[in-house]
């Protein structure tokens, strides 16, 4: 509202329609904005005007409400705006507003606002609708079994998907706004009695203190504003998910879920590294299968960090290779130093990934052929790369997609590149030092709630670690287990 207040002198809402029209025509810049529409109508012998944004209002609902005014007689119009709203606007969401800035924001948000001569209040009739796509399964967070719906860019649809799964009055959804220009809606979803109240109050205060024009990049902009962590710490402090079932499960566990309008992803906090590597498939399969998937994902993520640095260390010290690992030796002559091969491939893979994102779908297959055959096979034949280097980097590239977090994938990539460089320069001592620094980066890292990022490893808790590694059975009713046995 600050930007609107700074732009115009705002007066009190008048009970004279002409004064309100002059004021809001200037405030909303009706003559310049073709999509801001106003209609002057008659209600019981009184002049009235409704403002709305073309494309946001439900035409049939708004038309039905306005048609109900045509048959009103002058003696049937009540003296107060409250009585008028109660008698003649049969719609669930109607607010009586007197603040000019709030009315302007409501109109630009898609809420039709009605002014009636003789009333010093505005009727904000929430019959808006936003252009939205279907709640299809997200491309990133796919599952082998489970629900196939996903969040969209419309906030009310996303909150409805969560509310559908948690039908409990303790489930709370608070709405706040951020951005002096955009007035972006932010929903805080949590279970009363389970959420960390200190964390909740901290997040609310930080959102209220935001002084930005707009949340241009939605969640990422909000994350940077409410938690400005150090630039050299690559590990994500928030878990992002486009799945309503994942968000609902996190809320029931006592976490705070933040939804931002115009974004199809939910922010889950606080999140440790064990929370980030979890996926919905762990719970859509029986405990044994879920445990296998979870442990496999953790082991593969571990290998993406250490596979190429350990291989580089062995290639620099071939005498250390045991007999049962002879197959990892290079079979061809080295024309380019291994460290340069690995670093070039690290950047080349990111280049191919960016190219794939920006390539039209009809050209995806030709691009794959060029990347796989020309850049792969012929780069080995020409002597640029050794086949073993291509093999290990291919494994790292594919394994990086074993977990769904882009942020964690890039954090592991930065650590891997750091390990490669320090190992190439300082050999064994460099590898040991780099490993220790990576471990310390995790140890001294904290979640947004101030707890250990790698709990229950540090501080160690065997029972909690067991829950993180092993997918246990869901609790059953008393006596049901004995009957089943």
Regions found by a protein language model. Give the residues of each.
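Membrane-embedded alpha-helical signal segments
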Residues: 1, 5-310, 314, 320, ...
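Hydrophobic alpha-helical transmembrane segments of membrane transport and translocation systems
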Residues: 387-389, 393-485
């Amino acid at each position: 509202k600050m930007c609107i207040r700074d732009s115009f002198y705002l007066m009190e809402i008048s009970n004279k329609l002409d004064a309100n029209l002059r004021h809001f025509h200037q405030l909303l810049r009706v003559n310049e904005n073709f999509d801001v529409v106003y209609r002057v109508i008659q209600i019981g012998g009184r002049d009235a005007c409704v403002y709305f944004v073309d494309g946001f209002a439900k035409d049939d609902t708004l038309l039905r409400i306005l048609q109900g005014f045509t048959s009103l007689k002058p003696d049937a119009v009540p003296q107060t705006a409250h009585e008028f709203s109660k008698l003649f606007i049969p719609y669930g969401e109607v607010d009586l507003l007197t603040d000019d800035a709030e009315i302007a924001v409501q109109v630009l948000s898609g809420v039709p606002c009605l002014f009636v001569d003789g009333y010093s209040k505005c009727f904000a009739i929430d019959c808006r609708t936003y252009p939205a796509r279907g709640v299809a399964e997200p491309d990133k967070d796919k599952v082998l079994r489970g629900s196939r719906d996903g969040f969209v860019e419309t906030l009310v649809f996303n909150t409805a998907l969560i509310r559908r799964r948690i039908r409990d009055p303790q489930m709370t959804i608070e709405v706040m706004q951020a951005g002096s220009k955009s007035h972006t809606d932010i929903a805080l979803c949590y279970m009363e009695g389970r959420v960390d109240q200190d964390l909740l109050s901290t997040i609310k205060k930080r959102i209220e203190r935001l002084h930005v024009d707009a949340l241009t990049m939605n969640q990422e902009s909000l994350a940077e504003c409410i938690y400005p962590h150090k630039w050299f710490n690559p590990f994500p402090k928030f878990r992002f998910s486009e799945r309503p079932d994942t968000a609902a499960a996190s809320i029931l566990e006592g976490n705070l879920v933040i939804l931002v309008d115009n974004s199809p992803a939910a922010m889950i906090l606080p999140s440790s590294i064990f929370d980030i590597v979890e996926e919905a498939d762990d719970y859509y399969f029986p405990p044994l299968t879920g445990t296998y998937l979870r442990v496999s994902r953790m082991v593969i993520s571990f290998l993406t960090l250490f596979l190429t640095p350990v291989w580089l260390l062995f290639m620099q010290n071939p005498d250390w290779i045991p007999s049962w690992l002879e197959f990892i030796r290079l079979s061809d002559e080295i024309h380019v130093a291994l460290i340069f091969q690995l670093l070039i491939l690290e950047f080349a893979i990111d280049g191919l990934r960016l190219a794939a994102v920006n390539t039209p779908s009809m050209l995806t297959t030709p691009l794959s052929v060029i990347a796989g055959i020309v850049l792969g096979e012929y780069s080995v034949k020409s002597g640029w790369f050794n086949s073993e280097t291509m093999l290990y980097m291919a494994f790292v590239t594919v394994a990086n997609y074993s977990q769904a977090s882009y942020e964690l994938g890039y954090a592991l990539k930065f650590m891997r590149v750091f390990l490669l460089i320090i190992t190439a320069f300082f050999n064994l001592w460099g590898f040991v030092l780099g490993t220790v620094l990576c471990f310390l980066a995790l140890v001294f890292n904290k979640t947004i709630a101030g707890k250990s990022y790698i709990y229950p490893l540090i501080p160690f808790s065997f029972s909690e670690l067991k829950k993180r590694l092993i997918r246990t059975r869901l609790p059953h009713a008393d006596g049901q287990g004995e009957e089943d046995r």
